[in-house]
C-alpha cells in the first residue's frame, strides 16, 4: 500500500468514526427547515438520484432527519442558497458570476463549494460530452495547454494574445492562417463562467465569434478548417462528423488529456466540471453541524460509491480521485 493510500485509509476511518459518533439535530430556527420539519434541498435536477440516495444514507444514520427535494437545475440552487431556502446548493458546474455577485451582495462573502465528484465524461454518444475544445478534424495540432487556450480565446493574456495557428506550432498551409474562435454568447451562462473560472475574467478576444446555440457552434467549426471552439454539454456526433475533441494539458510540458472516463476519474482533465455542494459559511464561524455531517458522508466511501454507480448514466458522474478526495476532506475539516 502506498503512503498516499495509507493516509487516505486512515483519514477515511477517522472521518467515518466521527460522522457516526456525532448525532445531529434539525434546528427549526434554520430558514432551510420547512414547517413540517423537513430539511429543504434545492439544486440541479440531474443530481436528483444522487441526492436522494445520499439522503437515504444520511437518514439511516440520523433517523430524526428528513428531507424534501426541489431539484430544478443548477440555476435554481444558488438563488435558493442566497435566500436561505436550501441547506446547500447541489451544482454540476462552477457558480456563475451573477449568482456569485448576488450571494456576496446579501452576505458580504462568497459561498463555499465542496466537491463530491466529477460531472461527466466522453465523447460517448448519445450522452453529452462535458466541456471540451473542438477543432476541425483536419486540424494538425496534438493538443493545447490551458495557457494557450486562454491566449486564443481572450484578450490581455499575461503571455500575450495568439491570433495565428503558427503561434501554436501549426505548419504548412496553417502557418499564415488566422484562428477563428467560436463559442456561446457572453450572457452570464457557460461562456461567462468559462471566462471567470478559467481565463482570469479577461474579456473575449476580438476574434471570438459568439453564436446562439451549441449546435451552431459545432456547425461553424465543422465548416471552418481554421476554427476552434470551447463548448460544454453537447453531443457533437449527430451534428457533424467534421469535428474532433482537442486534448488539453494543465501546464506547459504536461501530458495532453481528453475528457475520457479514466482521465476524468483520475482528476487529470483540465476542463473537468465538478459535482459540488455550495454552502453558506460565514468567515470565522463554524459550518452548520447538520450540513457538515451531510458533506462528510458524501466524502466517505459509501457516499462516493453513489457517484460511482452513476458513471454509465446519462449524466456520467464519477467519484473524486484520491488526491482530490483528500483535499476536499481537509477543506471540510477546516470549515
Task: Kindly label every feature range from the protein language model.
Residues 3-19:
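Gram-negative bacterial Sec-dependent N-terminal signal peptides
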Residues 22-335:
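Flexible loop/hinge segments at secondary-structure junctions
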Amino acid at each position: 500500500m502506498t503512503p498516499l493510500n495509507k493516509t487516505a485509509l486512515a483519514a477515511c476511518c477517522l472521518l467515518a468514526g466521527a460522522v457516526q459518533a456525532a448525532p445531529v439535530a434539525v434546528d427549526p430556527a434554520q430558514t432551510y427547515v420547512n414547517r413540517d420539519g423537513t430539511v429543504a434541498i434545492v439544486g440541479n435536477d440531474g443530481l436528483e438520484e444522487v441526492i436522494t440516495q445520499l439522503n437515504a444514507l444520511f437518514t439511516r444514520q440520523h433517523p430524526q432527519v428528513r428531507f424534501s427535494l426541489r431539484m430544478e437545475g443548477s440555476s435554481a440552487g444558488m438563488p435558493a442558497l442566497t435566500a436561505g431556502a436550501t441547506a446547500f446548493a447541489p451544482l454540476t458546474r462552477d457558480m456563475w458570476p451573477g449568482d456569485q455577485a448576488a450571494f456576496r451582495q446579501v452576505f458580504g462573502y462568497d459561498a463555499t463549494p465542496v466537491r463530491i465528484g466529477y460531472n461527466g465524461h466522453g465523447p460517448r454518444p448519445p450522452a453529452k460530452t462535458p466541456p471540451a475544445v473542438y477543432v476541425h478534424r483536419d486540424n494538425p495540432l496534438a493538443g493545447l495547454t490551458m495557457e494557450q487556450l486562454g491566449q486564443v480565446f481572450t484578450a490581455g493574456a499575461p503571455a500575450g494574445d495568439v491570433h495565428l495557428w503558427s503561434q501554436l506550432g501549426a505548419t504548412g498551409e496553417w502557418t499564415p492562417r488566422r484562428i477563428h474562435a467560436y463559442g456561446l454568447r457572453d450572457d452570464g451562462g457557460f461562456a461567462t463562467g468559462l471566462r471567470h473560472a478559467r481565463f482570469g475574467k479577461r474579456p473575449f478576444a476580438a476574434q471570438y465569434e459568439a453564436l446562439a446555440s451549441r449546435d451552431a457552434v459545432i456547425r461553424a467549426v465543422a465548416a471552418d478548417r481554421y476554427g476552434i471552439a470551447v463548448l460544454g454539454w453537447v453531443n457533437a456526433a449527430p451534428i457533424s462528423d467534421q469535428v474532433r475533441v482537442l486534448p488539453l494539458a494543465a501546464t506547459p510540458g504536461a501530458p495532453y488529456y481528453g475528457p475520457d472516463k479514466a482521465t476524468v476519474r483520475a482528476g487529470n482533465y483540465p476542463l473537468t466540471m465538478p459535482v459540488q455542494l455550495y454552502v453558506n459559511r460565514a468567515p470565522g464561524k463554524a459550518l452548520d453541524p447538520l450540513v457538515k455531517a451531510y458533506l462528510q458522508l458524501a466524502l466517505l466511501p459509501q457516499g462516493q460509491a453513489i457517484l460511482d454507480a452513476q458513471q454509465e448514466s446519462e449524466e456520467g458522474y464519477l467519484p473524486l480521485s484520491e488526491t482530490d478526495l483528500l483535499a476536499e476532506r481537509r477543506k471540510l475539516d477546516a470549515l
